[in-house]
Curated annotation (Swiss-Prot):
Exhibits a tripartite organization, with its C-terminal part forming a homotrimeric 28-stranded OM beta-barrel (OMBB), its central part forming a long trimeric coiled coil that can traverse the large periplasmic space, and the extreme N-terminal part forming an SLH domain trimer that can interact with the PG layer. GO terms for biological process: monoatomic ion transport. Homotrimer. The keyword Zinc-finger does not apply. The keyword Transmembrane applies. The gene is slpA. This is Outer membrane protein SlpA. Gene3D superfamilies: 1.10.287.1490. PANTHER family: OUTER MEMBRANE PROTEIN ALPHA, OUTER MEMBRANE PROTEIN ALPHA-RELATED. It comes from Thermus thermophilus (strain ATCC 27634 / DSM 579 / HB8). GO terms for molecular function: porin activity. It is found in: Cell outer membrane. Plays an important role in the structural organization and integrity of the cell envelope, bridging the outer membrane to the peptidoglyan layer. Appears to be a nonselective channel. GO terms for cellular component: cell outer membrane; pore complex.
């Protein structure tokens, strides 16, 4: 059949080559015996050659190429059949020959597929290197012998081939076992990592076994390479057999004894692998036993030496010059920005501390009785050394915790020496956000999930003692012993309820309930807290004239594109400063409300509704609120309502129009008594609030979002707004822009920004115009890791009325050089110079500290000091503060080692009142 196929193909190709122009290939030499056939097939489109114009006739034909040639040939035949005309091809081939040709092609495709399977099987097989070497030697010896007479023993050859294949399969099985063991060893290594201290001896065994497995894997790779070579030889033998040629007797090439030796070697290899597997299994059992309980030790050591002083004792801020410098005192208390606190006169800042944490963790704790899953304890030496010698530094238990279960029900107990953290609800025992702390609390917090009890309550118990901090809060929310218990239940999935009791011995006691309910698209939530002083009967908790109440009810609903919300609330004035609720989060003495999380302020009673709905690109919003003091005293009620419509987003642009109305002096809800420009500027209303809520205003705003996917100008944020405060007749225009991410220009990264603000005040209000611009720039690392960075920000506010012809300005700039991996990897060095100055700023004297950091916030006027419209634009009046601050700063860091030095001077604009400051600091922290 194969001979007939070859004959038919040759004839067909010859016929196809008739009557067509000849194609030329650059590498088919003239006079070559196949040149005519090659050119004829190329002209017919069956052979196309390579893109470089060559035929590459000496390269092997792949199965893919063969399939492509046959496919093109069949296409040619089918096209000629469809024409139902005459052609050289059709005339030269008889119908029976054509049918035979198709059948032969299909048979050839099947044989090619079968050959692919056999080749893949041979590629996946493996044999030992020694056996292959022996077979190769025998083949070489056989080739050297003269060819015997025809008549080889076909049965012997088949037997030899069967034994070789069996040996390959055995070796392949051994290789698979070795690979499986290698994977098991990798997983084992991860477990061993967690118990390094207890498995030092076992690790050496595992590493030795891993080396052995690696060696076996490498051997298997070499064997596979040898098998590929042997495969080529076997294929050649198969071709000789299929071609009808007789081969020499291969008994003398490889006897049955030789093959048996190969099988014995494979069996020995398999036995060794089984033994190794047993060892690994034993190691895994030992690791599992050790992993039942894991122990850990961690801690840190830190030391600082240095001093920061000024020659005059003036404690001025240096964060304005160098953000994130090593001398910064950061933010604390009511300071929301580090520029509001002085840094330059800290004095001796030397000291050291140490901490050590011991931990234990049970991998699979029991579920019957009391079971501990993990526990930890932290010892601390807060003043390992300080500014004065002490022979016995204080060592204290700083924190401890235990987690586990009781009959499968989770529990936890946490102890803290000074910052015990817990919160029952917004108005009771809210003490989880004052980490400095201003109100030190030493105590425990225990939780228990009683899932096997009726209603599966979640119980929280807190107990401890608290006290004041003489330097921070002398009237804290908790003072003395305290205790509280909270029980939360969930009768069904949509309802949750919690009952609370809390007491601060000798000061306050309180009870409360809070919860929530979900009804389809609606959500309801609320709370009630009643607090009273000691000595009052329990019944007084339920009389709001004899106890202090805080309560609210909130409702939310979402109906398709429509969202609705409503609230009613009342908070007794005794909840101010967190007193009635025993909540340091609400402290105003030290934190100034910065930590507050309660939704409604003390001494308030009111209600409000809001709604929003979207129709395609249009969104409508509205609100209405009315609130007075807790007793709704006459004249205390403030009302506000407003609407806004936004069209967007198109290519990042949106258009918003808004209208608001604000009233004060009411005697009841929504009495709309006296229209005002804004309600409580700086408290209720502030300049950057959304759509100028709580003011009497209308306006329009166009904005472009540089982060939008379809932004017209990617990364560009642009806002332009016009607003009128119609009660007094003020008008306000602001336009500002910045980039959502730095702009890359060659080696430069640029973050520019711009602001224009014009306010025209009516009556006695000021009229002024502010221009502000700035840019932050840095370069990519240049030669030897050197890079440059800098920044500049400038604002100028010109007052033309009330007061007239007054100009206030601020200027800040910084330039620096950084060296990364300087002299050694991870050694970074930087040096910078910075300058800040201003005139006619809010306040008097020198600009010792800032009002806030707005240097590169272009939605605000100020750089570091007011005047600024944040409370209300008509309140932004200039002052008489003027001065400048200069300095240079050097810092080197190597991992957690920091060395810093800086010199600074605060002076008036004329340079006649200098205050010099100097700082030096070396600090290092080791964590283990």
């Amino acid at each position: 059949m194969k001979k007939r196929l070859v004959t038919l193909l040759a004839g067909l190709l010859t016929v196809l080559s008739m009557g067509f122009g000849l194609a030329q290939f650059s590498d088919v030499p003239a006079g070559h015996w196949a040149k005519e056939a090659v050119e004829a097939l190329a002209a017919k489109g069956i052979i196309l050659g390579f893109p470089d114009g060559t035929f590459r006739g000496n390269e092997n034909l792949t199965r893919y190429q063969a399939a492509l040639l046959i496919y093109r040939l069949l296409q040619q035949i089918e096209e000629e059949l469809k024409t139902q005309g005459t052609s050289p091809t059709m005339e030269a081939l008889a119908p029976e020959d054509l049918e035979a040709l198709k059948n032969a092609v299909q048979e050839l495709a099947a044989e090619l597929a079968s050959l692919g399977v056999r080749v893949s099987a041979l590629e996946d097989s493996a044999a030992t290197k020694e056996d292959i070497a022996r077979l190769e030697a025998m083949i070489a010896e056989l080739k050297a012998q003269p060819m015997p007479e025809p008549g080889m023993d076909q049965a012997a050859l088949k037997d030899l081939m069967d034994r070789v294949e069996a040996a390959s399969i055995a070796a392949d099985t051994a290789l698979a076992q070795a690979q499986q063991l290698a994977e098991r060893l990798d997983a084992l290594a991860q477990d061993v990592e967690g118990v390094k201290g207890d498995l030092a001896g076992l690790r050496s065994q595992v590493e030795a076994n891993a080396d052995a497995i690696q060696a076996l894997n490498e051997l298997a790779v070499l064997l596979n390479q040898d098998v590929l070579s042997l495969q080529d030889r076997v294929t050649a033998l198969e071709k000789m057999v299929s071609g009808g040629q007789e081969l020499p007797d291969l008994e003398q090439f490889a006897t049955k004894e030789d093959v048996a030796a190969v099988q014995e070697f494979a069996a020995a290899l398999r036995s060794d692998l089984v033994g190794l597997s047993d060892k690994v299994s034993k190691l895994e059992e030992q690791v599992a036993e050790l992993n039942k309980v894991r122990y850990s030790i961690s801690g840190s050591l830190s030391a600082t030496y240095g001093t920061v002083v000024t020659d005059t004792g003036t404690n001025f801020d240096i964060d304005r010059l160098f953000p994130g410098n090593a001398f910064s005192t950061g933010t604390y208390g009511s300071f929301s920005s580090s520029v509001q606190a002085g840094d330059s006169n800290q004095g001796n800042i030397s000291g050291g501390s140490a901490s050590l944490t011991f931990g234990v963790k049970v991998a699979q704790p029991g579920t019957s009785g009391v079971n501990v899953s993990e526990a930890s304890a932290t010892l601390q030496v807060p003043a390992a050394f300080g500014t004065a010698y002490t022979s016995a530094p204080t060592i204290r238990l700083n924190a401890a915790s235990v987690k586990g279960n009781v009959d499968g029900q989770a529990f936890s107990v946490v102890y803290s020496r000074a910052v015990s953290s817990f919160k029952f609800n917004d108005y009771l025992f809210a003490n989880d956000n004052d980490s400095e702390p201003a109100n030190p609390r030493q105590g425990m917090v225990a939780t228990f999930s009683a899932t096997k009890f009726p209603l599966a309550p979640e119980v929280t118990v807190v107990a401890g003692v608290a006290g004041p901090d003489a330097t921070k809060d002398t009237a804290p929310a908790l003072n003395g012993n305290y205790f509280g218990i909270r029980t939360a239940v969930k009768p069904f999935s949509a309802l949750n309820l919690a009952l609370n009791y809390a007491t601060n011995l000798g000061n306050r006691s309180a009870i409360g309930v809070d919860g929530g309910l979900e009804l389809g698209p609606a959500k309801l939530s609320g709370l009630w807290v009643s607090s009273q002083t000691p000595g009052s009967p329990f019944a007084d908790f339920f009389d709001n004239t004899l106890s202090d109440w805080a309560y609210y009810a909130q409702a939310e609903a979402k109906l398709g594109p429509l969202s609705l919300s409503a609230n009613y609330h009342a908070v007794d004035p005794q909840y101010a400063d967190g007193q009635a609720g025993m909540s340091e989060n609400e402290d105003t003495t030290y934190y100034g409300g910065e930590k507050a999380g309660a939704p409604y302020g003390a001494d308030t009673r009111g209600l409000g509704v809001s709604a929003s709905v979207g129709f395609g690109p249009v969104t409508l919003k509205g609100y209405a609120e009315s609130e007075g003091d807790y007793n709704l005293a006459p004249g205390s009620v403030n009302d506000a309502w407003g609407v806004a419509a936004t069209l967007g987003s198109f290519r990042g642009f949106s258009l918003t129009g808004f209208y608001n109305a604000a009233y004060t002096g009411g005697n009841g809800y929504f009495s709309l008594t006296t229209a005002v420009d804004a309600i409580a500027p700086g408290v209720t209303y502030y300049y950057t609030i959304e759509n100028q809520k709580y003011s009497s205003s209308w306006g329009v705003r166009v904005a472009h979002d540089g982060k939008a996917e379809d932004a017209l100008i990617p990364t560009l944020n642009l806002t332009a707004q016009y607003a009128t405060y119609y009660v007094s007749g003020h008008t306000d225009i602001q336009v500002y822009a910045d980039l959502a991410k730095p702009f890359k220009l060659a080696i430069l990264s640029l973050s520019p920004g711009f602001r224009y603000h014009s306010f025209a005040g009516a009556g006695s209000a000021p009229t002024y115009t502010t221009l502000k611009g700035g840019v932050q720039v840095s370069t990519d690392p240049l030669l030897f890791g050197l890079s440059l960075d800098g920044a500049v920000s400038y604002r100028r506010t010109q007052y033309t009325n009330n007061p007239s012809n007054v100009t206030t300005y601020e200027l800040y700039y910084r330039a620096g050089v950084k060296l990364q991996d300087f002299l050694a990897p991870k050694l970074n060095f930087s040096v910078a110079y910075a300058h800040y100055e201003g005139d006619q700023l809010a306040g008097t004297g020198l600009p010792v500290v800032g009002s806030g950091n707005q240097a590169f916030n272009f939605a605000r006027d100020r750089v570091y000091r007011s005047p600024d419209p944040i409370a209300a634009p008509w309140l932004a009046t200039p002052g008489t503060q003027a001065g400048k601050l200069d300095g240079f700063y050097i810092e080197a860091k190597y991992y957690d080692l920091t060395v810093a030095y800086g010199e600074f001077v605060l002076d008036d604009l004329n340079g006649t009142n200098p205050n010099f400051g100097r700082g030096f600091k070396i600090s290092y922290t080791v964590k283990f």
